[in-house]
Amino acid sequence: MIVRTTDEITGTERDVAGPGWRSKRIVLGGDGVGFSFHETTIDAGTTHEFHYVHHIEAVWLVEGEGTLTDLDNDQVYDLRPGTMYLLNGHEKHRVQARTTMRMMCVFNPPVTGQEVHDENGVYPLVAVPAS
């Protein structure tokens, strides 16, 4: 059994931030459970483009409001607490935060914690070390 709090993750290597966002990576590939689980915060007034070509991501919005745009077909979705979106087709997408948004995110395959978005918003596929 694994039990963690966001307080114990804050300020560690599992607490990752970039311009306009912060991700507390609660479960990572090294935990050996087949997925990773993150609490991600996106700052109000920011826009981010992502394209997870190697991962499927599920996102559950728990706080804030914004929009999600599927960049393959320009369809726009409103985001508010209680909204879930699943990028099961590896869709290139844009997230715009009207207010600060807090989301719970699941990645499969799991991220290791070492990934950094490249210039196209892509995480590389990083092998999970054998434990």
Swiss-Prot record:
Superkingdom, natural source: Bacteria
One BP term from GO: ectoine biosynthetic process
UniProt catalytic activity: (2S)-4-acetamido-2-aminobutanoate = L-ectoine + H2O
Signal peptide: none
InterPro entries registered for this protein in UniProt: Ectoine_synth, RmlC-like_jellyroll, RmlC_Cupin_sf
Gene3D superfamilies given in the database record: Jelly Rolls
Pathway(s) annotated for this protein in UniProt: Amine and polyamine biosynthesis; ectoine biosynthesis; L-ectoine from L-aspartate 4-semialdehyde: step 3/3
Annotated GO MF terms: ectoine synthase activity
Keywords attached to this entry: Lyase
UniProt cross-references to NCBIfam families, sorted A to Z: PRK13290.1
Stated role: Catalyzes the circularization of gamma-N-acetyl-alpha,gamma-diaminobutyric acid (ADABA) to ectoine (1,4,5,6-tetrahydro-2-methyl-4-pyrimidine carboxylic acid), which is an excellent osmoprotectant.
UniProt xrefs under HAMAP family: Ectoine_synth
Family: Belongs to the ectoine synthase family.
Name this protein carries in UniProt: L-ectoine synthase
Species name: Nocardia farcinica (strain IFM 10152)
Lineage: Bacteria, Bacillati, Actinomycetota, Actinomycetes, Mycobacteriales
